[in-house]
Amino acid sequence: MSATKYIFVTGGVTSSLGKGIVAASLAKLLQARGFSVTIQKFDPYLNIDPGTLNPYEHGECYVTDDGAETDLDLGHYERFLGTPTSQGNNITTGRIYNTVITKERQGAFLGKTVQVVPHITDEIKRNIQLLGESGKYDIVITEIGGCVGDIESLPFLEAVRQFRWEMGPTDTLVIHLTLVPYLNAAKELKTKPTQHSVKLLSETGIHPDILVCRTEHPLPAELRKKVALFCNVNINSVIESIDAETIYDVPLLMKKEKLDERVLSKLKLSSKNEPDLESWKVFLGKLKNPLSEVNIALVGKYVELPDAYKSISEAFIHAGAMNECKVKIRWISSEQLQKDNLQHHLGFADGILVAPGFGERGLEGKIAAVEFARENNIPFFGICLGMQCAVIEFARNVLGLKDANSTEMNKDTANPVINMMESQKNVTMKGGTMRLGAYPCELTKGSKAHAIYGKSKIMERHRHRYEFNNKYLKQYEKEGMLATGINPETKLVEIVELRDHPFFIGSQFHPELKSTVENPHPIFVKFVKAANDFAKGKK
């Protein structure tokens, strides 16, 4: 018998049904019972990782402690479980093929014809087991990206079929997420898409153990019986996943449906405890019953697709609940912003966040937003490029360096206050070559940053090529912009703050990536508090 149990989550009918949320919710319930759980995502695209994908294509690129550029679903896994993920938690078709082709070039297959079966499927199975073989986990949940029926997913499904055959029926389990749509004209829920989806999955040799049915309306007992009969599953294995007010309701909804009990029963696992979700319920209580409200302007260049800033919006939810304050984000395109319309676009704001990003498009609008926040004493938070915009704005409007810029935007600027890191100057490949992952940072005692964290040494995650140019540091500090977070090894500036401003913080790192339900990130918590205080002051 295997020491680790393996659960696979597949999806059908349509994408965006929420496989990641269902997987994370199940993992949370199992974790709350005392099991050690992790989740991995298999993405069926040919990119090695999503690091070079346009946010409009893929949404946010989530970065792990060990520097992996991954799918945004890993953010959900970390936020729900409160445990870090790694390179091994996100595998793409591109990585699988790259590994197999590299082995072939090295002669590892001894002249054999390299094929999808067995070579690609064997590599997929090896990656499924890597986390389980680490000895850290009782249960590994694997989410298979895409939909059943997609050509791209076929090798993964074949690998799952083989894996189940090899491991046996009590060490593996398949959950299939499907859609039960409501036809308004007929005034009824329809099961046919679910039946066809299960049929497609069965054609690959995989029969689901549990069906999770996404629906807008409750599933009547007769309909559950019909789904169970035609899809050949136990009636108590037809799980309703009704549309929720917030994704953070889903673990409680799945508990109500006894999803975790069904899983434990099928895997022959005795439950250690009833799920302890008290702290989760406290969080939900604060989230749903706020005592105040703040308006945050999120200034970015990808605001048409909020998923591009998924971790930021979730970090605001966590910080808002901590402050018992509803955070209303207004998405502001930086390309709209000019000096003569700032009051119109930003006058409502109790706080302004300038978002991370790359490239010149929308940069001047971000810089204008920084100036508006600085001059009007509005709480300000800049992340990555947002911090760099704060540095450029201060140089132009306070230090008098009118042509100050980043060498990313203007290689020939006379005042490169933001410069490419030395370690990046000879890098020619784009993918996976930035400064990625968790690095240490030392905070200046007596600074606002130190007060926010309550300690001197922190670790935060990064994704950048450019840095503050330390040649200008004395000029900045003389005029009141202080570098209060420094990397102890490279002296890279990680945090800047304004001395004479109620809340003005810029971070080169991405704090949103470490905010979880049970441990909201302190910068976001204090930023929301500052915005709340500012809002009260306006009344």
UniProtKB/Swiss-Prot annotation:
It holds the Pfam family GATase. Belongs to the CTP synthase family. CTP binds at S15, D150, I151, E152, K190, T191, K192, P193, T194, Q195, K226. Catalyzes the ATP-dependent amination of UTP to CTP with either L-glutamine or ammonia as the source of nitrogen. Regulates intracellular CTP levels through interactions with the four ribonucleotide triphosphates. It catalyses: UTP + L-glutamine + ATP + H2O = CTP + L-glutamate + ADP + phosphate + 2 H(+); L-glutamine + H2O = L-glutamate + NH4(+); UTP + NH4(+) + ATP = CTP + ADP + phosphate + 2 H(+). The keyword Nucleotidyltransferase does not apply. One of its GO terms (biological process) is 'de novo' CTP biosynthetic process. Its EC number is 6.3.4.2. ATP binds at S16, L17, G18, K19, G20, I21, D73. Keywords: ATP-binding, Glutamine amidotransferase, Ligase, Magnesium, Metal-binding, Nucleotide-binding, Pyrimidine biosynthesis. CDD domains: CTPS_N, GATase1_CTP_Synthase. The keyword Nucleotide-binding applies. The active site is at C384 (nucleophile), H510, E512. GO terms for cellular component: cytosol. Homotetramer. This is CTP synthase. Residues 295-537 form the Glutamine amidotransferase type-1 domain. NCBIfam families: PRK05380.1 (NF003792), PyrG (TIGR00337).
